[in-house]
Amino acid sequence: MRSIAIGHEPIKGGLKPIELIRPVPFCSPAFGFDKAAEYAKEQLKKIPTTYLRRHAAKLYAARFNSTTAKNPEKSANIFMRELVKRVDQIVTRSPLNITELQRDKRRKDKAKQLALICQQMGIVDFDKSMTLEQATALVISKYQKLAEFTINQIDTAPAYSTYEAFMKKGGNPEILADKLEIAIRRMTCDKWWQRKLNRARDMTLEHLNITLGLVNKKKSPYASLQAVNEFKYAKKSQQKWLDSMQLESDDGETTLDLAEVFKGSVSNPEIRRVELMVRIRGYEEYAQEQGMKAVFYTITAPSKYHANSKKYNNATPKETQAFLVNQWAKARAELNKIDVPVFGVRVVEPHHDATPHWHMLLFMLPEHEQVTTKALRGYAMQIDGDEKGAEQARFTAENIDPSKGSAVGYIAKYISKNINANHIEGEKDNETGGEFNNENGLVLNVGAWASRWRIRQFQFVGGASVGVWREIRRAKPEMLDKSTDVLREIFSAADNSQFAQFINLMGGAFAKRSERPIQISRVADGLNEYGEEKKRVVGLESCSNVLKTRLMRFALKKRSDSDAPWSTENNCNHPANDWQIGAGDRLNPIAFIPKEIRNNVLRGATYYEVDEQLKTITEFKVKNNQLTQESIGL
């Protein structure tokens, strides 16, 4: 027997070789054993990250060393060729090369390069003799070039849908130019590019994990171990930041711990779950009052969108979700043409291989049930509807009998599973067979999946505005003394969690936004860094009368440092490691730099922070009036 290592995996106390093994005499160079090992090593170099290469090496070695396959070397080489082909497709589609996927600094450098290219492409020589029409046309022309460049890099560009709509349908070119000018500022900003590249990094690495078979019920369901660990770290960092910050009113009389405010908001998973359940219960009660019936639908994408299928087309969960959204849009358009309205809720959750599927609880008039189900089934099965098992696996519709159980009961499990698993602890997951709990495990994996792919898990169809619901629940009874009767009734319904009554008072489940008696009231609040007008919610508006629900303004500040608060006038929306020093601006205490050495860092010193648990060293320094941060592994 002879073996050749094509990689190594860490074990306690050292490294274990990943070996190709052949018996005598087939292990000699004359039989191509050495060439086979070299081929494997060369192919493995094309796979990003040590972890993924190691996993691919183990899969290749397992096939190569098989004692049951007729031709194990051929089987292993076919596997490697197909795997590298899929990996190459993923990396080619990404704006990042292998090195940039792995290193923060390379992504920062690339962001600066792309922003600089856009700045050079966006240079405009305005002549004083230019008319407004000429200047507008010039801005639109410059945007078109920058958008084409940006789309080639990251498949999207800011305001591109607005630009496309204008080119197809026309409109006011001056209004368009104002919007495109803001988009141009984004495309010439390195921070904007860095956010986009970091997002591309997250999705590309997760896609690679999926295509290498690292996301499934045997390895890690719903999301890769890498995504789950990064999600856990992000949650831990978020909590640490929340604990370090507080809110202080403008007059300095009121101070609130940010962590406590968080616990009382819909950002708290339990409050979010309860609110969703209240809304769904209200939908059901309203439907019963209107004589409607409920149907529970489950829709799954064709097999070619599933990573565990032989037909897998290398699609990402994001692309699969886009496919499902498009098919749903077609079905709704068809129903709208024949005046068949529906309302309800959609829950998106992953299969164990990360492919999204939908659960929909829809309410409709009894006479509309068949045509609604026919439309949904038709578009769900429009692509590859004749493939094996499609009738059973791709679409199901279940009529809900109120005498056997409520509609809310059908959807409650899916809501809890995708938030915090409250009230379903210990229940078995159909996808993996594992048990739910509200601390980690499956719920954490689902959260990591939604976060990594930026997929909206819950979407209500029709009904009444939850924004108005939340805002009026902030009001106090004494605030409504001079309000209209309708406003007081709406407040009473919201204050007593009567969502069905709230829907009724807001004009019903199918009323247009313009027909609602109450709207959110917003006022201008300055410009953001791209010159875009910011809006601040102040309360509710009814018949030109404003009910102010936000009587105080708060600044965000560190609990241990009161001299430089975050506020809406002081870049409070910037990330915690990204602050700027502008002329006349106060410094934001966003940095993790100890106060006693902050001045030294501002004068050019470098500060290093060691994290023993994560085994990283983070370097902080000021460059071009901006605090930069880079982490490296120990």
UniProtKB/Swiss-Prot annotation:
Family label: Belongs to the phage GPA family.
Protein's UniProt name: Probable replication protein P12
Single Gene Ontology MF annotation: endonuclease activity
EC number(s) stated in the UniProt entry for this protein: 3.1.-.-
Transmembrane keyword on record: no
Domain of life: Viruses
Active site feature: 410 (o-(5'-phospho-dna)-tyrosine intermediate), 414 (o-(5'-phospho-dna)-tyrosine intermediate)
Function: Probable endonuclease which induces a single-strand cut and initiates DNA replication.
Keywords (A to Z) from UniProt: DNA replication, Endonuclease, Hydrolase, Nuclease, Viral DNA replication
GO BP, one annotated term: viral DNA genome replication
